[in-house]
Amino acid sequence: MWINYLVLVAVLLVGTTALAKRLRRLWAFIYGPLLLLSCISGDWLLRNLEFEDLVTATEASEAPLHRWNREIHQIFDRGVDSYSAPAGLEEMRQTARERHRNLLVATNDVEQVRVAPWHFSITRAQQSYERHGQAWSEHLGEWTAFVGPDLPTADGEIKASFDIAENDFLDALTLFPRFDLRSRVEDIFSERVLRLVTP
């Protein structure tokens, strides 16, 4: 009787071992694609989060430039006699100083955005916007020392760097962007015509 019992146990052990091997193979077959899918989806989410941080910082950096354009055009609208007078010149210099300070703080926030080393397109977008911010910083620096009579003209580097940044930002968008990123990027770069100060 006990011999039959030992045979039954042996058969069960052999069967269990074979079943375990089959289950391990099946698990490896399922686990590989699941692991790959989780890596891809995790990286997609990380890219969206990083790019959302960059777009938010860029929006904040654009704000002082839009404000500068509004303020300087308000001064121009008063007429040449107004902005060529000493008080008008000082008002323009002071406005430029304030916006320049705002821009430096906002540009620093753009530089501080953390990007994974393998997300090259986001890094490229970040660097191209930093160059654009530097071009604007130099331009506003000219306005802070403006004494007349010729107005500082917007350097062509501002427009060129803005166009490059636009292309890089569009390239950095993920396949299915989250956080309304596509429309936010389009909004940032939709006002290029209004940016250059031409009285």
Regions found by a protein language model. Name each.
Residues 1-20:
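Membrane-embedded alpha-helical segments of integral membrane proteins
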Residues 98-130, 148, 175-187:
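Short, solvent-exposed, charged loop/turn and helix-capping segments
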Residues 38-57:
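Transmembrane signal-anchor/signal-peptide helices with a preference for the extracytoplasmic
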Residues 19-27:
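Membrane-interface helix-boundary motifs at transmembrane edges
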Residues 28-36:
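Central hydrophobic cores of alpha-helical transmembrane segments
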Residues 51-96, 100, 138-199:
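C-terminal amphipathic alpha-helix
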Residues 13-14, 65, 103:
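Hydrophobic beta-strand residues in large extracellular and virion-surface proteins
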